[in-house]
Amino acid sequence: MNTPAQKKITIVDTTLRDGMSSVSHQFTPQNVADIARGLDRAGVGTIEVAHGIGLGASSIQYGFAAATDPDYVRAAVDAVENADIAALYVPGIATLAELQKAIDAGIKTVRVAVHCTEADCGQQPVEWAKEQGLTVMTFLMMSHKLDPEPLAEQAAKLDSYGADVVYVVDSAGAMVPRHAGDRVAALRQAISADIGFHAHNNLGVGIANALTAAENGATFIDGSLRGLGASAGNAQTEVLAAAFERAGWDTGVDLFPLIDTAEHIVAPLMKEPQIVDETALILGYAGVYSTFFHPTKRAAKKFGVPARDILMELGRRGVIGGQEDMIIDVASELAGRTYEIPASAAV
């Protein structure tokens, strides 16, 4: 039973965006509708829908999706009664034209994601989206790479552009609770916008990180049903709901419909259990972007070198999202041979 003394937290679900990475972006529009309907019935207020990398990412580089982003968005919009549908926009991958298509399909919220040192790359899409009347959430990806104070300086830029929410994003699953709490606390001192936290579970502390982020001032927390997401996956939406309720927070969601949606709709669609295997663990330990998970496994098999060695070297080099081509470079170097592009693939 809710009381006025309860603290409020907003859970945003990303099963239909980050979770796409776990199913090779192959959810169908019907799958999207079924999952969105379940989340809506449970009271989730914002549901993120798109290709796993975001709008406009369906390609040979990131993997082709089973449908277009507008098709996914329309399927979700038609399935819900109360929830807002959101989409992810990554500058350099998406374009404003693609964002307009998502708006036409029915999104009410856009989530603009930039590398944690490059908040200025978000100015154009944030300001443009605000002009279109969208709620704008912003992501500082790979937030573990900056100490709290410089991260807060980047957040202040996004705040100045008009962002409604600024997220600390643990893209690599490299944080432990102290890291999450310190960064959120620094943002709370620096910006007037609301603060969000997006966890990955590579070190097994996604839920703990989310709880600590909330205790330090985050009011928006991302999750995905069954933890579905890149590499080790995200904080699990249904577990977040239960844990926050046990910790005395009002989530505004109904736990049992969340569990039902996770168990009876999402689980049968999963290719494999969302676990912290060796590659996922080392990815978090090395601080490498979560989408490197499957390409690294493929490169390890192709070149006959351990995935852990590839990831540790990538971490040492400080690679970020968008530098997936470095996986082949590192794997070939570790194997002691030069990789040549097949003639059939040459342009």
Curated annotation (Swiss-Prot):
UniProt-recorded Gene Ontology molecular function terms: 2-isopropylmalate synthase activity; 4-hydroxy-2-oxovalerate aldolase activity; manganese ion binding
Cross-referenced Pfam families: DmpG_comm, HMGL-like
InterPro entries given in the database record: 2-IPM_HCS-like, 4OH_2_O-val_aldolase, Aldolase_TIM, DmpG_comm, DRE_TIM_HOA, PYR_CT
Enzyme nomenclature, EC number: 4.1.3.39
Catalytic activity reported: (S)-4-hydroxy-2-oxopentanoate = acetaldehyde + pyruvate
Biological processes, Gene Ontology terms: catabolic process; L-leucine biosynthetic process
Keywords assigned: Aromatic hydrocarbons catabolism, Lyase, Manganese, Metal-binding
Residues in Pyruvate carboxyltransferase domain copies: 9-259
Site residues (Transition state stabilizer), renumbered to this chain: R17
Uppermost EC category: lyase
UniProt keyword Ribosomal protein present: no
Binding site for Mn(2+): D18, H198, H200
Ligand binding (substrate): R17, D18, S171, H198, Y289
HAMAP family assigned: HOA
Family the entry assigns: Belongs to the 4-hydroxy-2-oxovalerate aldolase family.
Protein name: 4-hydroxy-2-oxovalerate aldolase 2
UniProt organism field: Rhodococcus opacus (strain B4)
